């Protein structure tokens, strides 16, 4: 769910998911998809594509279990769809950490209507 995702992002990046990524670029946060503005925005684009593959669970509301051991996210979920959702969230949190140097404040509250048609997943 959104709660686990937010926790993972905070653990990996040290940033608050809502205030730092909630409306970043064309792909972070709710709604729109568009051509990514930078590597950080591409992380969110790939994450949305990952979520599109989930068929038996709801990424907004369904909860899963994971642990944080030795600064690593471990998806412990038995349910296959929830485990896949956990892996999607883990991947975006790591991607955002790996691309912290591309984070650009000018995309923090980006006007989504300026986004061009998205790439396909």
UniProtKB/Swiss-Prot annotation:
Region (Important for membrane-damaging activities in eukaryotes and bacteria): 105-117
Any one GO MF annotation of this record: phospholipid binding
Keywords tagged on the record: Disulfide bond, Myotoxin, Secreted, Toxin
Tissues and organs where the protein is expressed, per its UniProt entry: Expressed by the venom gland.
Subcellular location: Secreted
Top-level division of the source organism's lineage: Eukaryota
Pfam families: Phospholip_A2_1 (PF00068)
CC annotations in GO: extracellular region
Disulfide bond positions: 26-115, 28-44, 43-95, 49-121, 50-88, 57-81, 75-86
InterPro entries found in the cross-reference section: PLipase_A2 (IPR001211), PLipase_A2_Asp_AS (IPR033112), PLipase_A2_dom (IPR016090), PLipase_A2_dom_sf (IPR036444), PLipase_A2_His_AS (IPR033113)
Family annotation (PROSITE patterns): PA2_ASP (PS00119), PA2_HIS (PS00118)
Gene Ontology biological process terms from the UniProt entry: arachidonate secretion; lipid catabolic process; negative regulation of T cell proliferation; phospholipid metabolic process
Family classification: Belongs to the phospholipase A2 family. Group II subfamily. K49 sub-subfamily.
Purpose of the protein: Snake venom phospholipase A2 (PLA2) that lacks enzymatic activity. Displays edema-inducing activities. Is myotoxic. A model of myotoxic mechanism has been proposed: an apo Lys49-PLA2 is activated by the entrance of a hydrophobic molecule (e.g. fatty acid) at the hydrophobic channel of the protein leading to a reorientation of a monomer.
Subunit structure, interactors included: Monomer.
Annotated protein name in UniProt: Basic phospholipase A2 homolog AppP2
């Amino acid at each position: 769910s959104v709660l686990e995702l937010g926790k993972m992002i905070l653990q990996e990046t040290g940033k608050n998911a809502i205030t730092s990524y909630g409306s970043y670029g064309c792909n972070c946060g709710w709604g729109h998809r568009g051509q990514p503005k930078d590597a950080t925005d591409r992380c969110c684009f790939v994450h949305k594509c990952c979520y599109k593959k989930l068929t038996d669970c709801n990424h907004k509301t369904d909860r899963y279990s994971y642990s944080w051991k030795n600064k690593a996210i471990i998806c412990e979920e038995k349910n296959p769809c929830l485990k896949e959702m956990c892996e999607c969230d883990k991947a975006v949190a790591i991607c955002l950490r790996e691309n912290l140097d591309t984070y650009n404040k000018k995309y923090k509250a980006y006007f989504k209507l300026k986004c061009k048609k998205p790439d396909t997943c």
